[in-house]
Amino acid sequence: RGSXLTHLPLRNISD
């Protein structure tokens, strides 16, 4: 988390 993608509902992307 913190990839920047934390604003997305895709929490599957931990990194």
From Swiss-Prot:
Signal peptide: none
One GO location term (cellular component): extracellular region
Any single biological process term in GO: proteolysis
UniProt tissue specificity: Expressed in chorionic epithelium (trophectoderm).
Alphabetic keyword roster: Aspartyl protease, Glycoprotein, Hydrolase, Protease, Secreted
Transmembrane segments: none
Cell compartment(s), UniProt: Secreted, Extracellular space
PTM comment, free text: N-glycosylated.
MF GO annotations: aspartic-type endopeptidase activity
Major subcellular location class: secreted
EC number(s) from the headed UniProt entry: 3.4.23.-
Keyword Transcription on entry: no
Entry similarity comment: Belongs to the peptidase A1 family.
Name this protein carries in UniProt: Pregnancy-associated glycoprotein 62
